[in-house]
Design a protein with these regions (language model features):
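A broad, low-specificity signal marking well-ordered, structured residues that form hydrophobic/aromatic
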Residues: 54, 83, 129-130
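Structured loop/turn residues at beta-strand edges in well-structured enzyme cores
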Residues: 52, 80, 111
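Catalytic cores and adjacent binding grooves of peptidoglycan-active enzymes
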Residues: 74, 87-130
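Active-site microenvironments of hydrolase-like enzyme catalytic domains
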Residues: 69-84
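Extended, low-complexity, intrinsically disordered C-terminal regulatory tails
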Residues: 41-70
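Extracytoplasmic cell-surface/polysaccharide-interacting catalytic and binding patches
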Residues: 1-47
Length: 130
């Protein structure tokens, strides 16, 4: 199911952990509405400005999946209001460009979000996602 020009519901609910553990990671109607807002108002504008594919490493998480991956009990992922993303190359340099694009869009008022976190945003150190 397409939620925006470049993003699908399947991308936002996909989880290797859920598959391995037999967890059904399906949003309810309110969570689906939130995911649609997330894609149309935040992710798609980022993708359009960045001009290259963006990979969603974690989107919606049901309660059971969130517990399994050690997510915070009040995580926005539980409500369909958060996504961890990175570039297709997942290099420091490309992720830095993506991060800078996001900050620019936020500063211009094009996107509105509560948090922007660059996890392990140091060259050659640990996982990289925004």
């Amino acid at each position: 199911m397409k939620l925006s020009k470049n993003f699908s519901l399947e991308e936002l609910i996909k989880s290797d952990t859920a598959n391995e553990c037999g967890i059904k990671n399906s949003p309810n109607s309110l969570e689906l509405k939130n995911l649609t807002n997330l894609t149309t108002k935040i992710l798609q504008p980022i993708r359009d400005a960045f001009g290259k594919p963006i990979i969603i490493s974690s989107g919606f998480r049901c309660i059971q999946l969130n517990k399994k991956v050690g997510g915070a009990s009040n995580s926005d992922h539980l409500f369909g209001a958060a996504a961890d993303i990175h570039t297709s190359s997942n290099t420091y340099e490309d992720n830095k460009k993506l991060y800078d694009t996001i900050i620019s869009l936020k500063n211009k008022g094009i996107i509105s979000c509560r948090q922007i976190i660059w996890e392990y945003g140091k060259k050659n150190v640990g996982p990289k996602w925004i």
